[in-house]
From Swiss-Prot:
This is Protein RecA. Belongs to the RecA family. It is found in: Cytoplasm. One of its GO terms (molecular function) is damaged DNA binding.
Amino acid sequence: MDENKQKALAAALGQIEKQFGKGSIMRLGDNRAMDVETISTGSLSLDIALGAGGLPMGRIVEVYGPESSGKTTLTLELIAAAQREGKTCAFIDAEHALDPVYAKKLGVDIDALLVSQPDTGEQALEICDALARSGAIDVMVVDSVAALTPKAEIEGEMGDSHMGLQARMLSQAMRKLTGNLKQSNCMCIFIKQIRMKIGVMFGNPETTTGGNALKFYASVRLDIRRTGAIKEGDEVVGNETRIKVVKNKIAAPFKEANTQIMYGQGFNREGELVDLGVKHKLVEKAGAWYSYNGDKIGQGKANACNYLREHTEVAQTIDKKLREMLLSPAVAEGPEAGEMPEKKEEEF
C-alpha cells in the first residue's frame, strides 16, 4: 500500500475508533482477544467433539432433539460448570418446567441462579436482551423456543391463525441479541424442540420450531439423541446418548460424542474417562480388569468408575492427559481442564 493510502487508512481508523470506541475495527492478526473463551459442557467427549474444549462465550448456541433426550440436562451441566468458574448464569424458563431439585443434583447452585418465567415470547426475549446489555451475565439458557409464544397469539382466540409470527419475533430478536452478546461476552443457549414436516417423501422430515433465523445466527448447533437405555437388572437407570455437532463456527463440525446420562446424576464422567482412556491407551484393559499406571482400578467398568469417583485426583489426572492429547495446547490449558466436580450420591 502506498504512503498516501496508508495515511488515509490511519485517519479513517482513528476517526472510527474515536466515534465508535476502541476495538470497533481492528486487523484480524493483531487481536489476541479473537481466541474464543469456552466453558466446559460437563462431558469430556462433547468438549473434544466441539474441538475447543467447550461452548463459546459471546455466541448463540442451539441445542435440539426429541423429548427426553437430555437437552435441559446438558444446559444445566453447563450452568454448573460455569458456576464453578465463578460465572453468573440465568435460566429463562418459558416452559415453566424447571425442577430445582434436579438442578441441584446436577451441581447447580440454585441460590445463585437467576430464573425468569416470562408470560410472553416478547417478554422473554426482552429479558434476554436486558441481561446481555447489563454485561453482568455470563451464561443464559432459554428453555425452550417452542414455548416463546407471541403476545398476539396469547391474547387472541384459540383458533386464530398467526402465520410466521414466532419466526418474525425470533428473527428480530437475533438481530438485536447477537451484537449485545458479543460485547458483553455472554453465551446464550436456545433449546429447541423437533417437529415433523408434513408430506415429505424423500429426505429428513424433521425440522425445528421458530423459523430459520436461529440456525443462521447460532455459532454452534447440537443435535442430542437418546440411543438406548442403561439398565441395572430390570431397572432403567440412565440413557445412552449421542450428541452430534451439526454446525460449528469455532472448529470442525460434524463430529459426534457418545456419552451416558444417568438419572439424577447427569453425565457419567467417570464412564467417559474409562472409555476414552482405553481407546487412547491411557487406561489398560486386560480381560475384565482395568489398570492405570500399573495399578488395578477395578474389575468391570462399573467398579473402575466407582474407583475414579472415590479417587478424584486419579480422575483429574486422566482428564487432564486426555485433554492434552485430544485438544490443542491452548485449549487444554483452560480453567476447566482437569476439574472433576463432586457428584452427590442421591437417588432420583
